């Protein structure tokens, strides 16, 4: 068993960097490992057009560490009123790489999202024409649907219909959490892919709920039972190019997580590739990590693969109990615990 693992530099195809003072922390954590990242647009107000995407992009670039070449790939936030002209302008910009479907009320800052899928069909047609991928938070939001069933329900009610109606539209089913989603993606045409988070590979709902409620495991879509966790691991290590890395690293200040009504999201960017390495090692599949982390994503998006490399070493280290997050602090995934892999920093 090797104690070193060298990969083409990976990318993160789903990250939340937040905004304002927090960028000084989140951008550096992402840039430490990733060459590029698909940056989620659910700010307040959301990133709805190319001009807003460019302004956000400039704020991210200004927060990059010195000499960093980290590239933010911007995303539009779809609303019921997103026009075909906005889609075409965004595509022509060269820096907007996708548009995101948030069902209204599904997750953090999704209140401006889509109320009926049919309301964005003209926008989706334009996206298919210009070659802009659709990113999907795949959960229904009706109050009567159990929170653990919302992903499967979304597939049956909406996603199958979208994929069938727009056969040339690239669709990324983001942060999948169920065996149902993995099976859907495997059986779908080649234009449908999926991201998988490290926390959904490493944990299930027992980790969040048994022995006390652990708010730093709370995310949306919520952690599912262990059989779904195993199905996600099967997909991730399969070598199937439809599945690729997307951390869904989503920081919230400690007081917003450790609360009577805590926010959803896990902060993993600070040690993302190390966490994925642990998950792949559980399956004796470290040889499949480079494909999942560094190859499948750019290939799906039609972007060049990175050419530089990173190296992980088998070395135990203790994750910090907290990290700075603007004017507050954030408790990262695995806070205070031992990690088994460590990114070898440049010059080390």
Swiss-Prot record:
Q: What is the lineage of its organism?
A: Bacteria, Pseudomonadati, Pseudomonadota, Gammaproteobacteria, Pseudomonadales
| Membership in a protein family | Belongs to the metallo-dependent hydrolases superfamily. DHOase family. Class II DHOase subfamily.
Organism whose genome encodes this protein: Pseudomonas aeruginosa (strain ATCC 15692 / DSM 22644 / CIP 104116 / JCM 14847 / LMG 12228 / 1C / PRS 101 / PAO1)
One MF term from GO for this chain? Answer: zinc ion binding
An annotated GO cellular component of this protein is: cytoplasm
Task: Specify the protein name.
Answer: Dihydroorotase
Query: What HAMAP family does the record point to?
Result: PyrC_classII (MF_00219)
Q: EC number(s)?
A: 3.5.2.3
Pfam families given for it? Answer: Amidohydro_1
């Amino acid at each position: 068993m090797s104690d070193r693992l060298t990969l083409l530099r990976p990318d993160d195809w789903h990250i939340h960097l937040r905004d304002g003072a927090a960028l000084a922390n989140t951008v550096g954590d992402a840039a430490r490992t990733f060459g590029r990242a698909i940056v989620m647009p659910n700010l307040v107000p959301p990133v709805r057009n190319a001009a807003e995407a460019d302004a956000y992009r400039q704020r991210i670039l200004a927060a990059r560490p010195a000499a960093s070449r980290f590239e933010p790939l911007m995303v539009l936030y779809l609303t019921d009123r997103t026009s075909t002209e906005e889609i075409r302008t965004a595509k022509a910009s060269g820096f907007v790489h996708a548009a995101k479907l948030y069902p209204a009320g599904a997750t953090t800052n999704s209140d401006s999202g889509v109320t009926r899928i049919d309301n964005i069909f003209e926008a989706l047609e334009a996206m298919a024409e210009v070659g802009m991928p659709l990113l999907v938070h795949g959960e229904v939001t009706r109050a009567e649907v159990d929170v653990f069933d919302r992903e499967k329900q979304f597939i049956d009610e909406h996603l199958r219909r979208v994929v069938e109606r727009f056969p040339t539209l690239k669709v990324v089913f983001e942060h999948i959490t169920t065996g149902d989603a993995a099976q859907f993606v495997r059986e779908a045409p080649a234009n449908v892919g999926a991201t998988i988070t490290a926390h959904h590979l490493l944990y299930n709902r027992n980790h969040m709920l048994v022995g006390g409620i652990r708010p730093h495991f709370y995310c949306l879509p919520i952690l599912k039972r262990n059989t779904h966790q195993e199905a996600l691991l099967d997909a991730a290590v399969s070598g199937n190019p439809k599945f690729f890395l997307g951390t869904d690293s989503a920081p919230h200040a400690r007081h917003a997580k450790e609360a009577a009504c805590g926010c959803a999201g896990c902060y993993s960017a600070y040690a993302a590739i190390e966490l994925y390495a642990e998950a792949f090692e559980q399956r004796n599949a470290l040889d499949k990590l480079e494909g999942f982390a560094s190859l499948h994503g750019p290939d799906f998006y039609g972007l060049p693969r990175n050419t530089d490399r990173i190296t992980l070493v088998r070395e135990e280290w203790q994750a910090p109990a907290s990290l700075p997050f603007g004017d507050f602090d954030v408790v990262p995934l695995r806070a205070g615990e031992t990690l088994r892999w460590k990114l070898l920093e440049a010059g080390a």
